[in-house]
Amino acid sequence: MAEAAGVPAESLAGCRARAARTVLDQVVLPGEELLLPDQEDGDGPGGAGERPLRLNAAARSRGRVVCGPGLRRCGDRLLVTKCGRLRHKEPGSGSGGGVYWVDSQQKRYVPVKGDHVIGIVTAKSGDIFKVDVGGSEPASLSYLAFEGATKRNRPNVQVGDLIYGQFVVANKDMEPEMVCIDSCGRANGMGVIGQDGLLFKVTLGLIRKLLAPDCEILQEVGKLYPLEIVFGMNGRIWVKAKTIQQTLILANILEACEHMTADQRKQIFSRLAES
């Protein structure tokens, strides 16, 4: 214990820090600090060729670094706050930087700013609607947060309606706040979802899988029946087909496809297409 007490804090911090490029697509744990390679200075605290990730003006020439879910800025480093796999997406310009986030598996949804979610209106308090989004507390939604809404022209929102919107405020110290308009004031598909259709819940991992650009599941589902579908990052899916039977079939397929292989999905889709 005496030897451990004599170790400088800087040495302990250096032991915790790891190079982000060496742990991409690997499991990271809460409390770990991430470093990125710095070509300008090879003698950093992370070892040869590594130094702390700079998030100030000095790093702008190397590209902007965006801190996604599961990561938090801690001085000039990134601190891991969730257990999961570290992911990275290169910027379109190819100038370095990009988006870093932790792909984690969790049951309860934690609101994230910019996420599009499906909520259920549970109450109306003055000019504010309370919306259940599956988090630890309901989100607030102003009646002015709809396209074309004014004090005289109020949106027709009732308790029990389904709302598709996005978060503009989402952090641990404030109540989540939703809007149904984009930065240009347009609805862009957001607002009250139709009365018909079926709402069901899936895992957060399946939602991310279905929303991936190279997802083949949606392409195969779209060939079966004409449908309307809305995905919420909070694990909720709303789907509507021509008949109730088709709607139930689509919901069952989407729920079951998470644990299916590609061959199993092809067999099911071929059988449904024949019938």
From Swiss-Prot:
GO molecular function: RNA binding
GO biological process: CUT catabolic process; DNA deamination; exonucleolytic trimming to generate mature 3'-end of 5.8S rRNA from tricistronic rRNA transcript (SSU-rRNA, 5.8S rRNA, LSU-rRNA); isotype switching; nuclear polyadenylation-dependent rRNA catabolic process; nuclear-transcribed mRNA catabolic process; poly(A)-dependent snoRNA 3'-end processing; positive regulation of isotype switching
Gene3D superfamilies: 2.40.50.100, K Homology domain, type 1, Nucleic acid-binding proteins
Cross-link Glycyl lysine isopeptide (Lys-Gly) (interchain with G-Cter in SUMO2) residue location(s): 151
Domain of life: Eukaryota
Subcellular location: Cytoplasm; Nucleus, Nucleolus; Nucleus
InterPro entries documented for this protein: Exosome_RNA_bind1/RRP40/RRP4, KH_dom_type_1, KH_dom_type_1_sf, NA-bd_OB-fold, RRP40_KH-I, RRP40_N, Rrp40_S1
N-acetylalanine: residues carrying this PTM: 2
UniProt main location, coarse: cytoplasm
Record carries keyword Cytoplasm: yes
Protein keywords: Acetylation, Cytoplasm, Exosome, Isopeptide bond, Nucleus, RNA-binding, rRNA processing, Ubl conjugation
Presence of keyword Nucleus: yes
GO cellular component: cytoplasmic exosome (RNase complex); cytosol; euchromatin; exosome (RNase complex); nuclear exosome (RNase complex); nucleolus; nucleoplasm
Subunit-level organization: Component of the RNA exosome core complex (Exo-9), composed of EXOSC1, EXOSC2, EXOSC3, EXOSC4, EXOSC5, EXOSC6, EXOSC7, EXOSC8 and EXOSC9; within the complex interacts with EXOSC5 and EXOSC9. The catalytically inactive RNA exosome core complex (Exo-9) associates with the catalytic subunit EXOSC10/RRP6. Exo-9 may associate with DIS3 to form the nucleolar exosome complex, or DIS3L to form the cytoplasmic exosome complex. Exo-9 is formed by a hexameric base ring consisting of the heterodimers EXOSC4-EXOSC9, EXOSC5-EXOSC8 and EXOSC6-EXOSC7, and a cap ring consisting of EXOSC1, EXOSC2 and EXOSC3.
Its biological purpose: Non-catalytic component of the RNA exosome complex which has 3'->5' exoribonuclease activity and participates in a multitude of cellular RNA processing and degradation events. In the nucleus, the RNA exosome complex is involved in proper maturation of stable RNA species such as rRNA, snRNA and snoRNA, in the elimination of RNA processing by-products and non-coding 'pervasive' transcripts, such as antisense RNA species and promoter-upstream transcripts (PROMPTs), and of mRNAs with processing defects, thereby limiting or excluding their export to the cytoplasm.
Similarity remark: Belongs to the RRP40 family.
Name of protein: Exosome complex component RRP40
